[in-house]
Amino acid sequence: MRHYEIVFMVHPDQSEQVAGMIERYTGSIKDSGGQIHRLEDWGRRQMAYPINKLHKAHYVLMNIEAEQSVVDELESTFRFNDAVIRNMIMRAKNAVTEPSPMMKAKEERFTKRDDREERSDRSEAPRAEAPAKAEAPAKAEDEAAAE
């Protein structure tokens, strides 16, 4: 069996169907004796250039180990599925299991956001209240009444 890296882009209007598509594709790979080493759903992203007047697409990355017949079946499935805008299947020398640079950047953004939320939670701690300045307007009213 050979190793492959597969990236496919799904029409943005069909984003809710991506989970089902991934399940079907992974099922066909596993049923034929293949393995999935890495599966990443990058979500809806801006494309580098418009394709079919679309500016965004839902991206999915898979690193698999499978027979050529399985890859041929996946390729024909991509070709006849109207929701798949583009796909790329590349043969790899070995299995890639570590997160892609896209996912590393996404994780860094989430950790930074979590840190910001944690700091904002600390800043919302109860503070000593400043004394009310209600006396100043009352003096002005008293002076106006005295005249």
From Swiss-Prot:
Bias kind Basic and acidic residues: ranges? 104-147
Keyword Calcium among UniProt keywords: no
**Listed InterPro entries:** Ribosomal_bS6, Ribosomal_bS6_sf, Ribosomal_S6_plastid/chlpt, Transl_elong_EF1B/ribsomal_bS6
From the UniProt record, give one GO term of the biological process aspect. translation
TM annotation in the entry: none
CDD domains membership:
bS6
User: What are the protein's UniProt keywords?
Assistant: Ribonucleoprotein, Ribosomal protein, RNA-binding, rRNA-binding
List the Gene Ontology MF annotations in alphabetical order: small ribosomal subunit rRNA binding; structural constituent of ribosome
What's any one GO cellular component for it?
Answer: cytosolic small ribosomal subunit
Q: Which Pfam families match?
A: Ribosomal_S6
| Superkingdom in the source lineage | Bacteria
The ranges of region (Disordered) come to: 96-147
The record's annotation in PANTHER family points to: MITOCHONDRIAL 28S RIBOSOMAL PROTEIN S6, SMALL RIBOSOMAL SUBUNIT PROTEIN BS6M
Q: What does this protein do?
A: Binds together with bS18 to 16S ribosomal RNA.
Give the record's family classification: Belongs to the bacterial ribosomal protein bS6 family.
Q: What is this protein called?
A: Small ribosomal subunit protein bS6
Organism expressing this protein natively: Photobacterium profundum (strain SS9)
Gene designation per UniProt: rpsF
